[in-house]
Curated annotation (Swiss-Prot):
It catalyses: CMP + ATP = CDP + ADP; dCMP + ATP = dCDP + ADP. This is Cytidylate kinase. Disulfide bonds: none annotated. PANTHER family: CYTIDYLATE KINASE (PTHR21299:SF2), CYTIDYLATE KINASE/PANTOATE-BETA-ALANINE LIGASE (PTHR21299).
Amino acid sequence: MDKRISIAIDGPAAAGKSTVAKVVAKKLSYVYIDTGAMYRTITYAALEQKVDIENEEQLMEVVKNVKIEFQQGENTQLVFLNGQDVSEVIRTPEVTNRVSIVAKHRLVREEMVRRQQELAEKGGVVMDGRDIGTHVLPDAEVKIFMLASVEERAERRHLENMNKGFDSNLEQLKEEIAQRDKLDSEREVSPLKKADDALELDTTSLSIEEVVQKIMGIVSGVFAK
C-alpha cells in the first residue's frame, strides 16, 4: 500500500462523516482533515469578536487573521485557533447552529478551499465535508457520499450533546438538522451534493464499524488496480 491516495467523504450534518473518516485515516496511517472544524473555527472566532456573520466583508477580516492547525491528540484530533486549543468550544450548539451561515459566503469558502487543497496536495489524506468530492478534491481516488435519515442524525447528535454535557432537545435537533440540510443544499457556492462518481452509502441502520469496513473494501479495490 505504498500508493498515497486521497479519500473524500461528503454528506449532510451528523451523518457520521467525521467519526468514520477518523477511523479510516487511522487504519491507513493517513492524515485526517476535518473541513467542518475549519468552518466551525471561523464561526467561533467571529462570534467571539461579535462580528455580523451575515456580513461577508467583516467575516473575511476574521478569516485573514485566523491560523487553523490540526494536531493528533491521544484519541482525537485537536483543533487550534492561533495557538489556542478550541477543539471543544467549536462543538457547542451556539457554533453548530451558525456554521452553515458562515459557510455560505463565497469568499470564505474560496479561502477555506484553498487552505484545504494545500493540506491535501501530497495525498495520503482522508477529508470530510460537504463539497470535498465535488469541489475541494475533485480528483480524489475514492469518493463517498454518506446519508442517514434526519431522525437518525438527530438521535446521534442528541447522544453526542448529552455525552458532552450540553443541553439537548431531540425535537429541536430534528428541526435544526433539517434547516442545516436546506441551507447547505441551497447555497449558491459549493452546495451539498453528491459527486457524479461518488459511491452513496446510507448509514441509517449501520454501525460505525460496518461503515468503515465498507469504505476500507472500496479503498482496497483502488489499491488493487
